[in-house]
Structure formats: structure tokens, C-alpha cells
């Protein structure tokens, strides 16, 4: 595959430059040389070596042949059904007046004309569709006049949009049903295999339990399953109604079912025991005994029976989950005076006095030195309630939905898998919640996640920490009843009410970030809701076949786009893990005397990891306050034409965007492939993979140099797991509403008339990952640390100077 001339500005085919030496990662020597050159002569171009890539333009003959092929394909599709094409394009033929029906001087068959909607028209139509999917004739006429469209075009657009939404929902539901069917088939096969090959529990050899018909075995297994279900339902009913379970015996070991396979007049009756945990788990376990002390065990990867102490612990978990669910629903449905709107931030915050009066604390008394943070946010999300519930109850999918907030998560124990689905599911989970700054430590929380269906299409998912019922458990943060209430709406949307209520030790937080945490912009409901809306919009855009993923013609095919997006996701995840020092990456913190205390330096070794270059990797990160708004700072850092003002990889010149994959209606949410200018005619330019995303709660700009041949393979649909890269980038957050007016005043004093905005300042996190030495056994030197520290300081100063705020 070639890039159709994206890497060369000439009209002819480009020359293969792969013989030029190239290193696609930040290296210690390259950074040191660049910084030295920048310090001596800032106006000169910075040196950088890179390999080449054979990227030729298509000849005119090839383009002509491609045009003929496309034209012939279009004509064949048109002959098969113009009406279908008209509806799939969401375009409509212009209406023909009565005077135009005169066929004396024109062909008998009128020629239809098609019009592609503009992005502005599509945006307005989408906003109306979100509110009303079935507009009446008056609304359609009003839209047609406002958007300069024919009423029939508006009518057909809404018809096609409803059909598209229905198709997407059905596709997703079918996928869920197929997954459930595959799980049931696998479980059925494992059970059949275990029954066909029973094993002796004493000697481990095969055993025969006698002649039992398959129908009888099925009946007894079904009987055992129903008994377990009855026990579990009785336990749940007792908890809901507040009654004791003493009247109904819940077995703590097994259900004994006599089979009667004894022979020869023996007084010892035969039998077998079906052993099952108290609450349903992922897969069954059968223990078969012959009534004489020896047992036959057929195990299918299931836990041991629940002991009395385990049952008592689970009972306490269930009590806590039910109390938390009741509190969450009441808090979500209650407005004033429990929730009041903050005059500083404009968000709904909790009235602590009213909360203490209305609710009893289910997590125990508040610890000394802890501060409370509570917020509430409501909005519509383009996802149905069942899909959102499935995502939240699956730890891996939950982390993928919130990649910048959840660094690591796991399901410790499945206490209850639910009744016929997720209704009643109760999981014990552990998570690491992060804010993209080295000045805010990762929050380690262990909590229960309980899911309950309150009505048709209405679900609630609640989290609550288990510190109050687990002995010896203590942390610097705990979650009070928090979660979301989800209600289905028309057109595949859901109304989500999100509540976040936490208590944390503020002494571990840097003073620069304390206002941000107090007003709920760091871990509050506003940030969770913004991230959910952006991620769901991204998934909808990428799954939609009618939305173009590139604003310009691109040589990337469908498989290439998927591979490129997968590579960008890995790059962003590694960047977040480096900023927050996630436990997934084995970072070791370095304490260097001549490094500023707000700059965190870490190191680790990379060995046998195809996604990273081998050797010693150095990570430097810091956070600073900037007297500019988050949006202005994001637009500056994400603009490829302005990278030469701060990026040493730009070689002192502007970069060119070669490919652009949109991930949302806002063009800023995208993955781009950039080309840096070559230093001289004898060297080829380098490629930079960049992902940018922004929502109402913050923004990130992540980039990494990539190897040109490897990137060419990725754009052809190759496996991106073997592309080695080291990410760097920026995380942008608002400064905290408590100091908005002060920050806005300082911004006016610093910037003057150069773009003052009322939102106040921003909190900018800068992070670099650099390959110091390609030998994993090499030792780290003080000079390497000083070079990385100088790099991060130089970058911050360049950004301040470019935005005219270097005096702050």
C-alpha cells in the first residue's frame, strides 16, 4: 500500500527513502542534542533523524481507471434500484413543477438530482432527532425553511435515521444474545463431559455409578438447580422483608438425592450428592458419592461450597448493598433541599445538613481528617439501559468505557449473578481511580456493586465501600452510596442520573488541586457523565456505516482504521498509566535533589514487550497552572501547524496532517497521523500518531513518534500490537470553580487583550516517556535525569511564551 502522495508534496511518485537511518522514539542523545541546540540557537532547526517510506502518487492513468471502475459500479447499483439508493444516501430528488412536465424539448425520463447534506444541516437534524424522532408536518416544514431543504428531504432523513437507529440496537441485542448462547452451550458441554467421565474422589481413577437413564439424570440435576434457586430467593426475600431465615433451612454443603443403585440385597443404599454453592456462580460443580464414604467428583471450574462464616459475610454484604441501593434511589429522585445548585460551579451539590438528617450512614462514622465530596448530574446518553448495565457490571468493559478515570479494576468475588440476567447481581470489586496529574494520588477502593431493575427499562447500579464491615480494611478514600439511575428513552437513548458521594483524606492532595476536588470536577458526577457521553458518541460514530471517518480522502481502509484506532488506544492507556503511576506498569520513583518537588521522575525496564522499545525508560511528569481557558489551551496544543512553537520533534517547522479519523461530532475528538518536516533534503520526514479528545470535564492530547514501515503495515490492516512506541502528551483540566473569578482577573492582567476568556485558568499536566538506554541492564545516570527535567521545563516555558503568559 502507498499513501497516495500524502508524504510528498510533489505531483510525481515519491522515491523510496528507507535506507536513511531512523529512530522512532525519544532517545536520550537526541533529546540532549535538541535541547542543546535550542539553548544555543533557538532560531535554527533542530536535528532529528528518521527513516524513509515509499509513498508514491497514483499516476493519472491509475486514477482514470479507478474512476472508470467506480463509475461502472455506481451505474450498476443505480440500475438495480434507484429508490433504495435514494433512501440510503438520505438525499431526495428536487420537486418538479407542472411547467417542467413539458416533454416537447426534453427527454421523457426526468433526471433526478441529488444533494448531500452539509455538516451544519446534519448537526441541526441530529439535535431535533434527539428531542423528537417523529416530527409532524409543521415541524418538518419549519426545519426545511430553516435548513434550506425540501420537506421531502427532511421527511426521508428522519425515516432513514430511525431505521438506522433500530438496526444498530437490534445488532447490539443480537450480539448479546449470541454471547449468552455461546456461554450456555459451553456450560452444557462441560456438564455433559463431567457426567460421562466421573472421577473417584479417593483414588482419582474412573468410576461407574450404575445404570441411570439420561432423562433421570436431567431431572435430578434440574431438581438440584431449583432447590438452589429456592434457597437463594428465600434468602433475598428475607433480606428485603427484614425476616429471619431460620424457618427455611439453607444447606451449607450439598443437596443429597438418593439414586438407589445398590444391588445384591445390600443394606447400604447407593446415592449421589450434587454439591453446589449457596449462590449461583459461573459454572456448576457436581460431587457424586456412593453412600459408603468414597466419593466421585466431577468438577467444572466452580468454587467450593459456602461455609457458615462465608454465608454470614455475604449476608452482611447483602444488607449493605440493599441499604446503599435504597439511599441512591432516594437521592436521585430528591431535589431541593437535599440538592442545591452551587453559585460558584453551577452544579448540583449536596446539602450536608439535610443529608445527615434524612439518611443514616451505612458505611459507619466519618473518619477524622476526611472531607466529603458529593455531586449530581443528569443527562441523555446514546445507549440503552440494558447495554449500560452490562458495561458497568463487567469490570473490563467498565474500564474501557472510562479509560482516563479507571486505571485498573477487577472483580474480586461474584456474590450473586442475578436472577435471569443482571437483576439482583452483586459483585465485590476493586478499582484504581485516577486523575491525570502526578500531584493527585490514585484512589484505591474496594466496594460492592449492586444492580437492580426497578421497572421495565429502569435500572439502578450502586457502589458502596466495604470498609465498615471488613476488619482491618482502611484506605484514604471510600465511596458512600454512589452510582447511576438509568431509564430508557426513545431512539436508543437513555436518561442517566449520576451521583458521586465520597470521603477522602485531603492531606494527600496537592494544594493546587484541592479546589478542583472540592467542587466535584475531578472525581464528581459531572466528569463521569461527560466521559460517558463522549465515549458512547464515539462508539456510535465508529459503528455507523453512514458516517465518514475522514474529512478528506484517505488511503486507509476499514481494517486499517480499526488497527490504527487500536494502536491509538494503547498509546493513550500507556500515557495515563505513566502520568498516574498505575500498578499495571512497574514504575520506580526516583528522588533527585536538583529536580523540582512538583516534577515526578520514574523509571522502569522494558524487556520482551513488542509494544515498547527494549531498554530503560524514563518518565517525567509535572502539573502547572496556566492563565488561559482549557479550550484555548487544547486548541493550541492540538494544532499541527503550531507544534513548532513547543515540540522539538517538529524540527522547527509546521506539521502536516496525513490522515484523520473522527471519533465524535466535534472534530477535535479524533486520531491523526502527522508528518514532521525533514531537516534537509537527504533525510525523510518522520510520522507522529496523535489522539485528541475533549469533553465538558477536561481534555487530553497524546502523541508518539512511530516507525514508518510499521505504520504503513498498520494502515493496511496489520496487527498494531507489534508497533513499538513511547507516548507523551498533555492533560488539561479546569482550575476549579472556587477560584474562577481570581483566575479570570489574573488572566486579564497577564494576557491583556490577547484572547481573555471568562472561564479562568487551566491545570496543565505535561508528561514525557523517553528511552534512555536500549540496554535493559544499563545503569541510569544523573545526566539522563537532568536532561529529561530540562526537557519538561523547556516545553512548559515554550507553551507559556507562545500563549503570552510566561510572566506568571
UniProtKB/Swiss-Prot annotation:
Residues 310-541 form the START domain. It is found in: Nucleus. Residues 158-233 form a coiled coil. This is Homeobox-leucine zipper protein HDG1. It comes from Arabidopsis thaliana (Mouse-ear cress). Its main location: nucleus. Disruption phenotype: Defective cuticle phenotypes leading to curly flag leaves and organ fusion. The double mutant pdf2-1 hdg1-1 exhibits abnormal flowers with sepaloid petals and carpelloid stamens in association with a reduced expression of APETALA 3 (AP3) in the epidermis and internal cell layers of developing flowers. Increased cell division leading to cell overproliferation. Residues 57-121 are annotated as: Disordered. Residues 108-119 have a biased composition (Basic residues). Expressed in trichomes forming at the base of young leaves, in endodermal cell lines around emergent lateral roots and in the epidermal layer of the stamen filament. Interacts with CFL1. Binds with BBM. The lineage of its organism: Eukaryota, Viridiplantae, Streptophyta, Embryophyta, Tracheophyta. Residues 79-90 have a biased composition (Basic and acidic residues). GO terms for biological process: cell differentiation; cuticle development; maintenance of floral organ identity. Probable transcription factor. Promotes cuticle development probably by modulating the expression of the downstream genes BDG and FDH, possibly repressed in a CFL1-dependent manner. Involved, together with PDF2, in the regulation of flower organs development by promoting the expression of APETALA 3 (AP3) in the epidermis and internal cell layers of developing flowers. In opposition to BBM, seems to promote cell differentiation and giant cell identity via transcriptional repression of meristem and cell proliferation genes. GO terms for molecular function: DNA-binding transcription factor activity; DNA-binding transcription factor activity, RNA polymerase II-specific; lipid binding; transcription cis-regulatory region binding. Gene3D superfamilies: Homeodomain-like. Keywords: Coiled coil, DNA-binding, Homeobox, Nucleus, Transcription, Transcription regulation. Pfam families: Homeodomain (PF00046), START (PF01852). Residues 110-169 bind DNA. It comes from the Eukaryota. Belongs to the HD-ZIP homeobox family. Class IV subfamily. InterPro entries: GLABRA2/ANL2/PDF2/ATML1-like (IPR042160), HD (IPR001356), Homeobox_CS (IPR017970), Homeodomain-like_sf (IPR009057), START_lipid-bd_dom (IPR002913). One of its GO terms (cellular component) is nucleus. SUPFAM superfamilies: Bet v1-like, Homeodomain-like.
Amino acid at each position: 500500500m502507498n499513501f497516495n502522495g500524502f508524504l510528498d508534496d510533489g505531483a510525481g511518485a515519491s522515491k523510496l527513502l528507507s535506507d536513511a537511518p531512523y529512530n522512532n522514539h525519544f532517545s536520550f542523545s537526541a533529546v540532549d542534542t535538541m535541547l542543546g541546540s535550542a539553548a544555543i540557537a533557538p532560531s535554527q532547526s533542530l536535528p532529528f533523524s528518521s527513516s524513509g517510506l515509499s509513498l508514491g502518487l497514483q499516476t493519472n492513468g491509475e486514477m482514470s481507471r479507478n474512476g472508470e471502475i467506480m463509475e461502472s459500479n455506481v451505474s450498476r447499483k443505480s440500475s438495480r434500484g434507484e429508490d433504495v439508493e435514494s433512501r440510503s444516501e438520505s438525499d431526495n430528488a428536487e420537486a418538479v413543477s407542472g411547467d417542467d412536465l413539458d416533454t416537447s424539448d426534453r427527454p421523457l425520463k426526468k433526471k433526478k438530482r441529488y444533494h448531500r447534506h452539509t455538516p451544519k444541516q446534519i448537526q441541526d437534524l441530529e439535535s431535533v432527532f434527539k428531542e423528537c424522532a417523529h416530527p409532524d408536518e409543521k415541524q418538518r416544514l419549519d426545519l426545511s425553511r430553516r435548513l434550506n431543504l425540501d420537506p421531502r428531504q427532511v421527511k426521508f432523513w428522519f425515516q432513514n435515521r430511525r431505521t438506522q437507529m433500530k438496526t444498530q440496537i437490534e445488532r447490539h441485542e443480537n450480539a448479546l444474545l449470541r454471547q449468552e448462547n455461546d456461554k450456555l452451550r459451553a456450560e452444557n458441554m462441560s456438564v455433559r463431559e463431567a457426567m460421562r467421565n466421573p472421577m473417584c474422589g479417593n483414588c482419582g481413577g474412573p468410576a461407574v455409578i450404575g445404570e441411570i437413564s439420561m432423562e433421570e439424570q436431567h431431572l435430578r440435576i434440574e431438581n438440584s438447580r431449583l432447590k438452589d434457586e429456592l434457597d437463594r430467593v428465600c434468602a433475598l426475600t428475607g433480606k428485603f422483608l427484614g425476616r429471619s431465615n431460620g424457618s427455611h433451612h439453607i444447606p451449607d454443603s450439598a443437596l443429597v438425592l438418593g439414586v438407589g443403585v445398590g444391588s445384591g440385597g445390600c443394606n447400604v443404599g447407593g446415592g449421589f450428592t450434587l454439591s453446589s454453592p449457596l449462590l449461583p456462580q459461573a459454572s456448576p460443580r457436581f460431587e457424586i458419592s456412593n453412600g459408603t464414604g468414597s466419593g466421585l467428583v466431577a468438577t467444572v471450574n466452580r468454587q467450593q461450597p459456602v461455609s457458615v462464616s462465608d454465608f454470614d459475610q455475604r449476608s452482611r454484604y447483602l444488607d449493605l448493598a440493599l441499604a446503599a441501593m435504597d439511599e441512591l434511589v432516594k437521592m436521585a429522585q430528591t431535589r431541593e433541599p437535599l440538592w442545591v445548585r452551587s453559585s460558584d460551579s453551577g452544579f448540583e451539590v449536596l446539602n450536608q445538613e439535610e443529608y445527615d438528617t434524612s439518611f443514616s450512614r451505612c458505611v459507619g462514622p466519618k473518619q477524622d481528617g476526611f472531607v466529603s465530596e458529593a455531586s449530581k448530574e443528569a443527562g441523555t446518553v446514546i445507549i440503552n439501559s440494558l447495554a449500560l448495565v452490562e458495561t458497568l457490571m463487567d469490570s473490563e468493559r467498565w474500564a474501557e468505557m472510562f479509560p482516563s478515570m479507571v486505571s485498573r479494576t477487577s472483580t474480586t468475588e461474584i456474590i450473586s449473578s442475578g436472577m435471569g440476567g443482571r437483576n439482583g447481581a452483586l459483585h465485590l470489586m476493586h478499582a484504581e481511580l485516577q486523575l491525570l496529574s502526578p500531584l493527585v494520588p490514585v484512589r484505591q477502593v474496594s466496594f460492592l456493586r449492586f444492580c437492580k431493575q426497578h421497572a421495565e427499562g429502569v435500572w439502578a447500579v450502586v457502589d458502596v465501600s466495604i470498609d465498615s464491615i471488613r476488619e482491618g480494611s482502611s484506605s484514604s478514600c471510600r465511596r458512600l452510596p454512589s452510582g447511576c439511575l438509568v431509564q430508557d428513552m426513545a431512539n436508543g437513548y437513555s436518561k442517566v442520573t449520576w451521583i458521586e458521594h465520597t470521603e477522602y483524606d485531603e492531606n494527600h492532595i496537592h494544594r493546587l488541586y484541592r479546589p478542583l476536588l472540592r467542587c466535584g470536577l475531578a472525581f464528581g458526577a459531572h466528569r463521569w457523565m461527560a466521559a460517558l457521553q463522549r465515549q458512547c458518541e464515539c462508539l456510535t460514530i465508529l459503528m455507523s456505516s453512514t458516517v465518514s471517518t475522514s474529512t478528506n480522502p484517505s488511503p486507509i481502509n476499514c481494517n486499517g482504521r480499526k488497527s490504527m484506532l487500536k494502536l491509538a488506544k494503547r498509546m493513550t492507556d500507556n500515557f495515563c498509566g505513566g502520568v498516574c503511576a498505575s500498578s499495571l506498569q512497574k514504575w520506580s520513583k526516583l528522588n533527585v535533589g536538583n529536580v523540582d518537588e512538583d516534577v515526578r521522575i520514574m523509571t522502569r525496564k522494558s524487556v520482551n514487550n513488542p509494544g515498547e522499545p527494549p531498554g530503560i525508560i524514563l518518565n517525567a511528569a509535572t502539573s502547572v497552572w496556566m492563565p488561559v481557558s482549557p479550550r484555548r489551551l487544547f486548541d493550541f496544543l492540538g494544532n499541527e501547524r503550531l507544534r513548532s512553537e513547543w515540540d522539538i520533534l517538529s524540527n522547527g517547522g509546521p506539521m502536516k496532517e496525513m490522515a484523520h479519523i473522527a471519533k465524535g461530532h466535534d472534530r477535535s475528538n479524533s486520531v491523526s497521523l502527522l508528518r514532521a518536516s525533514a531537516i534537509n533534503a537527504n533525510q525523510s520526514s518522520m510520522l507522529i500518531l496523535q489522539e485528541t479528545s475533549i469533553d465538558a470535564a477536561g481534555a487530553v492530547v497524546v502523541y508518539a513518534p512511530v516507525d514508518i514501515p510499521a505504520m504503513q503495515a498498520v494502515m493496511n490492516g496489520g496487527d498494531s500490537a507489534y508497533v513499538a512506541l513511547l507516548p507523551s502528551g498533555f492533560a488539561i483540566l479546569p482550575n476549579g470553580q472556587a477560584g474562577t473569578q481570581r483566575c479570570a482577573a489574573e488572566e486579564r492582567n497577564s494576557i491583556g487583550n490577547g484572547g481573555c476568556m471568562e472561564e479562568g485558568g487551566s491545570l496543565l499536566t505535561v508528561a514525557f516517556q523517553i528511552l534512555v538506554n536500549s540496554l535493559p541492564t544499563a545503569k541510569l545516570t544523573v545526566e539522563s535525569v537532568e536532561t529529561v527535567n530540562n526537557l519538561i521545563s523547556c516545553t512548559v516555558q515554550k507553551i507559556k511564551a507562545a500563549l503570552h503568559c510566561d510572566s506568571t
